[in-house]
Amino acid sequence: MKQKLTVIVIVLLSVFGVKEAKAQGIAVKTNLAGWAMLAPNIGVDLCVSECSSIEAIFYKSAADSWLKNANFTALQFGYRYWFGREPLNSLFCGVTATPARYEMKIKDSKRKGDCLPLGVNIGYCYPLSDKLNIEVSYGIGMLYLYEDITSVSDQGEEVKASRHKTSFSPTNIEIGISYIIK
């Protein structure tokens, strides 16, 4: 999984042509919607030109989350195009990819798998002060899912199955706070 994430980071940086980081464009951020679901997260948004930025947010579920016996880890990557005069302070649209690995127990079955939501998003960053912003965004796209399911039959035997699924769904919901460092 770490190798896949490394490859994704390299590809994103190559595709979007990071040549220099702008002096006034580094922000530390967190998604409050994630915290509300007991998924602590921290991220960074880095301006790569006068009207674009890249972001990375790491999510890790809490030990006992809202879904009993659930555990997941995700790393969201994104590219944003800012329509205002300066990045990190206006309307934006972008693309996101969020590779994730999860393990959960639902009723009598255990599910373990990987998923990859790929989508487009739109949002707005509201400045509260020179350094502090509130950010709201929503994204839709495709969700690719592969999971192994282990359950117990009525006879008490362990039954294993695998499932691949592709669906159109929301890919991210963000109500976040960001603090501009530079």
Q: Where are the regions that the model predicts?
A:
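Predominantly the C-terminal beta-signal and adjacent terminal strand-loop region
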Residues: S129-K182
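Sec/Tat signal peptide C-region and signal peptidase I cleavage site
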Residues: G17-A23
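Bacterial N-terminal signal peptides
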Residues: V7-V15
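Extracytoplasmic loops and strand-loop junctions of Gram-negative outer membrane beta-barrel proteins
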Residues: G25-A27, E103-K107, G156-S162
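Short, surface-exposed coil-to-beta transition loops
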Residues: L38-N41, G119
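Short N-terminal segments immediately surrounding and downstream of signal-peptide cleavage
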Residues: G25-M37
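Gram-negative (and chloroplast) outer-membrane scaffold detector with strong preference
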Residues: L46-V136, E174-K182
